Amino acid sequence: MEKLVTAVGAMSGTSLDGVDVAEITTDGQKIASFGASAYHPYSAADHNILSLVLGKWPEEQGLETARGLIHQRHLEAYQMLDAAELYGFHGQTLAHDPRGRGTHQLGDGHVLAQRLGKPVVWDFRSKDVALGGQGAPLAPFFHFACAQWAGLNTPVAFLNLGGVGNLTWLNPSCAAPEEKAALLAFDTGPANAPLNDLMHHRLGQPVDQEGRLATTGQVDPKLLSRWKMHPYFFQNVPKSLDRDAFSAELAELADMSLPDALATAVGFAAFGVAEAVERCPIAPAALYLCGGGRHNLALCDAICAQVACPVQPVEAIGLNGDMLEAQAFAYLAVRVLRGLPISAPMTTGVSQPISGGRIAGLDF
């Protein structure tokens, strides 16, 4: 076994709710232990600043304030935990168009490395996109390590319910995640993003707590039937989504009551998950939920009603579903440091397993 490294990863997702930070100790292959974690929420003002730059590319104007905000909030989040040997910094995804302009995560690892005085791994997605991959999702290699850490030995699936849903099907009996039969991963469709946007725009609230409002609404079946014909659901896997890929469809919720709009968005998210599970190479023995969306009971109930396998939170196998993404970027940071692959043909569509990312501050 290589020397163990204690790393802290951070994730600011497309839901724009805050920064998760989490510590992990690993050699880049096996997980030795999980450490402390913390959540640093964005204020309403922070949310507004970031919302205004969604969709922008690096060469566009008006990013300076948001970039400074991302650096400051991540620094504050990192400092909520004890100092680590290495930091993983994903940045804030503003735009994702892997077959066109590429992918844009706001933030500079060099700035954080200077302020932390420790190496920072960042820019995890660009190399994958440059080599023909989707650049997403990147958590699957970590999910594979988690399944082995939990002692699983049959194919299962992990579903991250963030702004967008991401499914990872995995076979933990394989020796390494880059093996062809070990993983299949792709985005399922919208998840929390439209729900949170509806709550923010209509009520000025960040989330529909436990999906309470959604449970009082009625799904619009005609709208849902039409949305199911979106070209994304007919694309080959692996594939990935931008946060706003379904913005034209979701704009049709504007004239509905809030409960009905939420219920319809929940129904659409659940359909995307069910359609994704059907594409798994072998039916998963269980679907494990992580991410903020697993707290939305309306969404979880809708998913349970549409998939054939048992659905459980990842806490059922000893994991922290709120921190899995942050833990993933701590784990991936160590893999980048060691030159190990972080994506493969069956996770992003890249031509061969590759180690992406850049490392700032190696001289510290």
Pin down the residues of each PLM region:
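Phosphate-binding/catalytic loop of phosphoryl-transfer enzymes
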Residues: 2-6, 98-103, 118-205
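Glycine-rich phosphate-binding/hydrolytic loop that grips phosphoryl groups
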Residues: 12, 16, 267, 315-364
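Conserved ATP-utilizing enzyme core subdomain
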Residues: 14, 18-32, 39-42, 176-270, ...
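Conserved non-catalytic scaffold segment of RNase H-like nuclease domains
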Residues: 33-69
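Short beta-strand-loop/turn "lid" adjacent to the catalytic site in phosphate-handling enzymes
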Residues: 57-109
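Phosphate/ATP-binding catalytic cores across multiple sugar-kinase/actin-like superfamilies
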Residues: 73-81, 259-283
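Glycine-rich phosphate-binding loops at beta-strand->alpha-helix junctions
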Residues: 94, 284-306
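Conserved nucleotide-sugar donor-interacting segment of glycosyltransferase catalytic cores
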Residues: 108-122
